[in-house]
Regions:
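Lipid interaction determinants
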Residues: 18-76, 84-134
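Bacterial N-terminal signal peptides
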Residues: 7-15
């Protein structure tokens, strides 16, 4: 019985990082989901909300802040890269990168891979619609 429990535990330990990594969207999935679309976002760390549009070529995102310190302001950020694994990097005074998870309920959560939110789940996106609806 101990051997069965040990083997089961080992399988779970080894498989966990693999399944976790597979939860992130790849480049193709991110482009199909977000490029040429407008959606709502919430910063999970400070609570601010915004509406964002990413152009159809996935080169620029425009953010209109609804609440928080930047409420009422609009910023344009250049997307500087998107890896095949789905890591997207953009500029905002500094370069920030993230990976995105499809939560399966119409929402998406971003995990920082660089910058001040590295390794933190910091953004939730929802209500995706076609075109620029800012």
């Amino acid at each position: 019985m101990r051997r069965i429990l040990f083997n089961t535990a080992m399988v779970l330990i080894v498989a966990s990082p693999i399944s976790y990594a597979e939860e992130f969207m790849n480049k193709e999935q991110r482009q199909a989901t977000f490029c040429g679309k407008t959606f709502y976002g919430k910063n999970l760390i400070n609570g601010s909300t915004f509406k964002i549009h990413i152009d159809s070529e996935c080169k620029t995102n425009t953010i209109h802040f609804l609440t928080g310190k930047k409420a009422g302001k609009t910023e344009e950020r250049k997307i500087i890269s998107m890896s095949d694994e789905g890591e997207l990097c953009h500029t905002s005074n500094r370069d920030y990168c993230n990976k995105m998870k499809n939560m399966g309920d119409g929402t998406y959560k971003g995990i920082g891979t660089s910058g001040r939110w590295k390794d933190k789940e910091y953004v939730k996106l929802s209500n995706i619609v076609d075109g620029n609806q800012l």
